[in-house]
Amino acid sequence: MKIIDNLFSLSLALALILILVIFNVYAADQSICNSGTTVVLHDNGLVKSCQLKDDYDANNIRCKNGGSVSFYSDGKLESCVLSADATVAESKCKADGLISFYIDGKLKSCMKQDN
């Protein structure tokens, strides 16, 4: 029984590591930015902020074309203008409003939908 418990714990740990690797590999490059507008880069070369040329999906958040977007230095979404209504951690966020996240991915703020 102890062997089964150990195998289960090991498989959970491996699954968690795999999930973390998948989410951290995802980082935006300058191709998502509107040409002719200011693109700010982090020291590591990843996009810090720019104006989007097209809608952009980041971890189930759809950011609006023409809107501003910003990323943390590890490539995680910091903020953007929502292209469509979104529900994040039970908060209903309004399209065309700014949404922002903490570096750990938790919702920081958004424009709430009208009830």
Where are these regions (language model features)?
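Short linear motifs centered on Gly/Pro in flexible linkers and helix caps
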Residues: M1-K2, V25
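Bacterial N-terminal signal peptides that target proteins for export
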Residues: K2-L12
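Bacterial N-terminal signal peptides
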Residues: S11-I22
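Glycine/tyrosine- and acidic-biased, solvent-exposed loop/turn segments at the edges of beta-strands
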Residues: N24-N115
